[in-house]
UniProtKB/Swiss-Prot annotation:
Cofactor(s) needed by this chain: Ca(2+)
Annotated glycosylation sites: N50, N58, N63, N68, N88, N146, N235
Full protein name: Neuraminidase
Molecular-function GO terms, alphabetical: exo-alpha-sialidase activity; metal ion binding
Cysteines joined through disulfide linkages: C92-C417, C124-C129, C184-C231, C233-C238, C279-C292, C281-C290, C318-C335, C421-C446
Residues of the active site: D151, Y402
Span list, region Involved in apical transport and lipid raft association: 11-33
Keywords, in A-Z order: Calcium, Disulfide bond, Glycoprotein, Glycosidase, Host cell membrane, Host membrane, Hydrolase, Membrane, Metal-binding, Signal-anchor, Transmembrane, Transmembrane helix, Virion
Gene name in the database record: NA
Family the UniProt entry places it in: Belongs to the glycosyl hydrolase 34 family.
Catalysed reactions, as listed in the record: Hydrolysis of alpha-(2->3)-, alpha-(2->6)-, alpha-(2->8)- glycosidic linkages of terminal sialic acid residues in oligosaccharides, glycoproteins, glycolipids, colominic acid and synthetic substrates
Residue span of region Head of neuraminidase: 91-469
Additional facts recorded: The influenza A genome consist of 8 RNA segments. Genetic variation of hemagglutinin and/or neuraminidase genes results in the emergence of new influenza strains. The mechanism of variation can be the result of point mutations or the result of genetic reassortment between segments of two different strains.
UniProt GO cellular component terms: host cell plasma membrane; membrane; virion membrane
Length: 469
């Protein structure tokens, strides 16, 4: 091959390589453009690990979904009409409880970024159920988790995440600064109630759709506190119960009626010798029933029921199947406070069905361990200790904690009745275990009129963590 032929051959090869390279670059540009068009153009594509954020604009829901793709957030929107959660239906007839969620927050938090929390509770709109919780401004297995056994601090905040997920900075939404809280949905937007401030002058901040709409000042200057579970909404109005005063003596109790986040009416209960704290409230046939904690002198639970005009009735669950902790062994009940082992207590709940009652309680009579559901067909009004159903939820050898009620409205379930549900806090760490922190995970169950099973669904995290050693 002479020199001219070599030059022509080499030039031809270079030209072919250049053309191929140019075609590859053009193909790459087209591929990137098509991929970007698909990501930004598809308004209805479901992606895993989406975070849905609901905003309220001109009486129309806008469901904003931030889809994480290659560390870039692309915003998609679709309008969802608001409704009114009527709350006029009766509780659904049930025969037992089906497991609904379990977040395993402590187990996941040994290696992942999970908030140190307490007082978790669940509330549902007509679109979704969310877990609300009070953080300590710290993560598990981190130095700031030290000393988080304390109930009230300026670092505590109310946050929420999708039900069943471990609460982390990546899936959680800030709601309010609070060391005591409640939240509920009226069919249009979320109402949150967050109490913070000094013990002798705390203030409850009400937010509607994330915007401050009202405040409630402590009226007895003695640790204003509220439910630590969902408020209850009927026909566009939402209701909550607050306490102000001693935790071991006569205190003051008020019911508040709120509309679009503003207090429109309140009434103070005339309840001498009663003690109401941390009420678990639910709607039933257009009225509200709350079952609460007596931290003063009752090992059975006090209740208050009221209509939308705040006309109320009060009493104690009469059953000899006692619902508080600590408590005596089951025996003869009373429609007033049962005094033996009546001091102190734990947040709890019950569901009234006529003269009968579903009672949720710890299995242990003197520690926050184990959990069970008991059906006493005459327990709301009768004082004997007989019952017909017991369903195991957590074994007595495993820790439990607070528990509370929530409901699923027909607008969510498609049923013609209000489904009763409950959650159980599974407390881990101090003061019972050798850690520097106190936190918890949670489980939840909903009532069904079909097959169910009793078992134990414990937290089951292996302690201590690295930070504790």
């Amino acid at each position: 091959m002479n020199p001219n032929q070599k030059i022509i051959t080499i030039g031809s090869i270079c030209m072919v390589v250049g053309i191929i390279s140019l075609m590859l670059q053009i193909g790459n540009i087209i591929s990137i453009w098509v991929s970007h068009s698909i990501q930004t153009g598809n308004q209805h594509q479901a992606e895993p690990c989406n975070q849905s954020i609901i905003t309220y604009e001109n009486n129309t829901w806008v469901n904003q979904t931030y889809v994480n793709i290659s560390n870039t957030n692309f915003l998609t929107e679709k309008a969802v009409a608001s409704v009114t959660l009527a709350g006029n239906s009766s509780l659904c007839p049930i025969s037992g409880w089906a497991v609904h969620s379990k977040d395993n927050g402590i187990r996941i938090g040994s290696k992942g970024d999970v908030f140190v929390i307490r007082e978790p509770f669940i509330s549902c709109s007509h679109l979704e159920c969310r877990t609300f919780f009070l953080t300590q401004g710290a993560l598990l297995n981190d130095k700031h988790s030290n000393g988080t056994v304390k109930d009230r601090s300026p670092h505590r905040t109310l946050m929420s995440c999708p039900v069943g997920e471990a609460p982390s900075p990546y899936n959680s939404r800030f709601e309010s600064v609070a060391w005591s809280a409640s939240a509920c949905h009226d069919g249009t937007s979320w109402l949150t109630i967050g109490i913070s401030g000094p013990d002798n002058g705390a203030v409850a901040v009400l937010k509607y759709n994330g915007i401050i709409t009202d405040t409630i000042k402590s009226w007895r200057n003695n640790i204003l506190r509220t439910q630590e579970s969902e408020c209850a909404c009927v026909n566009g109005s939402c209701f909550t119960v607050m306490t102000d005063g001693p935790s071991n003596g006569q205190a003051s109790y008020k019911i508040f009626k709120m509309e679009k986040g503003k207090v429109v009416k309140s009434v103070e209960l005339n309840a001498p010798n009663y003690h109401y704290e941390e009420c678990s409230c639910y709607p039933d046939a257009g009225e509200i029933t709350c079952v609460c904690r007596d931290n003063w002198h009752g090992s059975n639970r006090p209740w208050v029921s009221f209509n939308q005009n705040l006309e109320y009735q009060i009493g104690y669950i009469c059953s000899g199947v006692f619902g508080d902790n600590p408590r005596p062994n089951d025996g003869t009940g009373s429609c007033g406070p049962v005094s033996p082992n009546g001091a102190y207590g734990v947040k709890g709940f019950s569901f009234k069905y006529g003269n009968g009652v579903w009672i949720g309680r710890t299995k242990s009579t003197n520690s926050r361990s184990g959990f069970e559901m008991i059906w006493d067909p005459n327990g709301w009004t009768g004082t004997d200790s007989s019952f017909s159903v017991k369903q195991d939820i957590v074994a007595i050898t495993d820790w439990s904690g607070y528990s509370g009620s929530f409901v699923q409205h027909p607008e969510l379930t498609g049923l013609d009745c209000i489904r009763p549900c409950f959650w159980v806090e599974l407390i881990r760490g101090r003061p019972k275990e050798s850690t520097i922190w106190t936190s918890g995970s949670s489980i939840s169950f909903c009532g069904v009129n079909s097959d169910t099973v009793g078992w134990s669904w414990p937290d089951d995290a292996e302690l201590p963590f690295t930070i504790d050693k």
